[in-house]
Design a protein with these regions (language model features):
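Conserved residues at the C-terminal ends of beta-strands
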Residues: 67, 84, 115, 134
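Conserved beta-strand in the GNAT
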Residues: 49, 57-69, 74-82
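Conserved hydrophobic beta-strand within the GNAT/NAT acetyltransferase core sheet
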Residues: 78, 112-115
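Short amphipathic alpha-helix that is part of the acyltransferase structural core
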Residues: 1-59, 154-155
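Long, hydrophobic N-terminal alpha-helical segment
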Residues: 35-44, 52, 68, 74-79, ...
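Conserved acetyl-CoA-binding loop-helix of GNAT-fold acetyltransferases
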Residues: 83, 89-102, 125
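Conserved active-site alpha-helix within GNAT-family acetyltransferase domains
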Residues: 105-110, 117-151, 155
């Protein structure tokens, strides 16, 4: 099989498959999940998917979401990293993270933060270190004018 890594918003045929992978780990209604996934865009936040291709069969097997970290130049936050349950232990998690790292580098980001509650050992094994929390407004960043964001993050 082949693996390909894609921005979800450029590949609308994978929205439902992506929602299923996320809902397997974090339950939400399908409509709520699709609503949030459809906010993925080039200017961030962006949902990225790992697709397994076996001939004509294509299946979403992994996901990550990247948002801008406010108040920290050239920094982004990676969250909602997940691999389909029946595909775990096959190196797909590492592949999602490696491809996500390459994606953010191409976009000009130099620092990548992530959030996790139960996978600290996995990320430590990949070379990540614990740090102080960072702030990302994710899909809501556009709701605040730049001057308010600047004031908020320079307090």
């Amino acid at each position: 099989c082949d693996l390909t890594f894609l921005p979800l918003h450029e590949n609308a045929e994978y929205y439902e498959g992506c929602a299923e992978v996320l809902n397997e780990e974090w339950k939400r209604s399908l409509s709520a999940r699709l609503h949030s996934l459809q906010k993925s865009c080039d200017t961030f936040p962006v949902s990225l998917i790992l697709v397994e291709v076996n001939g004509s069969n294509k299946e979403v097997v992994g996901h990550s979401r990247v948002s801008i970290v406010h108040g920290r130049e050239k920094s982004c936050l990676v969250e909602s990293v997940v691999v389909k349950k029946n595909k775990r232990g096959m190196g797909y998690g590492r592949k999602v993270m490696t491809e996500t790292e390459e994606f953010v580098k191409r976009k000009g980001y130099e620092w990548m933060y992530l959030t996790t509650h139960d996978k600290q050992d996995f990320y430590k094994h990949l070379g990540y270190e614990f740090c102080n929390p960072v702030i990302s407004l994710g899909f809501n960043a556009h709701l605040l004018p730049d001057h308010i964001l600047l004031d908020f993050f320079t307090i």
